[in-house]
């Protein structure tokens, strides 16, 4: 298939003598920084023989360019001052040097390069042969000899824009970790279909902070919104060839610039500063509503792909410094990300770039934290992972970054890439063990039992409910990294939605154009009897109860819960578990809710209110099983169906799938009793003695909506819990 890329004519590169720049008189700061006389520029290109900063003016009919020679400074940095430059000026770099791809050197002055420190961009890259530093064929494939391409990329590449350095007054919610509930969302998909928002704001930064959006977030009870990447991005050529785009945005073009296409059309038309203002305005309005803003960030790789990919920025500036290469074959990239390249975090400039970018988003934009995609790559020193990597030491000791929320996706695709629980404080980790355990207990094991098979025992379930101390309770600090270092989740952007987890046995990714080969096969899902949509009332009821079991387990487990946007309303992606290229109805939240969806939303909101209002669900430390500060009951007691302390042998018995967990409110809050019945039939239980005060039935997952009952039971009372259910009781202190 021939790639659907631009073939419009572009000019050949013409070398000419650049104008001289003036030496910088003040401190050197990477990027472009305005002052009263003009602009200071500094860029890293350690293997270059010459570097030019190029100021570009474009119109529909003509592109003009002024080139200025920079001076080599210390540590491979090139600097210069150019008078008369003002905010709004487009610019890039041309880098001269050795062309030797076999040695990892890809200098080609025909390619105008985006400043890695640009704070704004104008024009998205246009997929065109001129974007490649090497000669490519009609399908954008390289020739065997990797000759340098002499076409000028100025008309098809992204340009940086000089902007004013602005101070931003930021009033943060500063939500404590124990109160934090994270809501993972895409800027576009969150509001593209949301009624009550003006059409021009839907699917934009402004729409994400519209009062209608904020009302939903506040009513639901989340405290932080974690946006999928909003760094400027570029779609991969193979997606462009299919007429698709990288909707999720895990293909970064620049680490400082917000993605322009997520701004309102009016902001895009007004220019880069208006886009920046819209992003800052979004953060400010969310802060005013008490909602923190977290960003999913992708520092592990860039959009330049493998060695046959385009040359947009880093590759042309200093390919052998920015990217990991095979030491024996320097022309070969090492890829631990599955995206063609990996940034080399053994290099101080890569660490500095990452830290500078993070600080910029905190101090200038106002964000409250980050989730690091494929974070193991950020902690690699060669093939090994160092949990005290210099990047993490720097973040932990940085006066700015140590004060925001830092979350790891604790794996990558390289050797030894699974590292959940092994990152340092004060960071938190996505807890995939929690996800897998809860899915197994509530979804796949009941399916196996109903079909004559056998489930697992309860040990791992209890460990996850109690905060995963096996993963987060160790280390040099007493108490380990702490109970809120576990980011508990059932679903995320990649994988099935909560609805699809209980409606599909198999992924259905045909719409992605990869013959259903993409996306994981390890879904731990169960369709409850019919694949996909059904009118069978029994199956639909069972699916909804399983979802309520999962939500309750997520919300009341110790740790920090994360909910995927739309799950609270039973969002479906029609079985697509890898909708990264689906910028459409498959990915956007459908806000036209039926009664069952409204009921689920009410239930999730109610459960989150219970978590917020009861300190019992938000302990300070890991449980000990002992009496804390003279309390008359242990901080946590595991009980069997008779209300007696769980005997050891029952923990190992796969036929025992019923447990009670009594959590102390320490005499200040109500004690909470959770009864988990993992059997496909109802079971008789005896409630524990507790403090001797009555137990109030608060909620059961068999209920379609919260009931606000007055039902109470005396300690030791006999009752029956429904099949496959999660039941919650409260007992008030004396």
Model-inferred region functions:
Residues 1-183, 188, 205, 539-548, ...:
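Carbohydrate-interacting/catalytic domains
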Residues 42, 180-181, 223-226, 290-292, ...:
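Beta-sheet entry/capping signal
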Residues 43, 93, 185, 227, ...:
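Conserved, mostly hydrophobic/aromatic
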Residues 45-47, 72-74, 84-86, 97, ...:
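Short, flexible loop/turn elements at secondary-structure junctions
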Residues 100-104, 191-193, 233-237, 301-304, ...:
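Short catalytic/ligand-binding loop motif for oxyanion handling, primarily in non-cytosolic enzymes
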Residues 186-367, 374-400, 405, 417, ...:
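Substrate-binding/active-site clefts of carbohydrate-active enzymes
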Residues 340-343, 372-377, 528-540, 585-592:
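Glycine- and acidic
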Residues 366, 381, 387-565, 569-570, ...:
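Conserved alpha/beta catalytic core and glycan-binding cleft of carbohydrate-active enzymes
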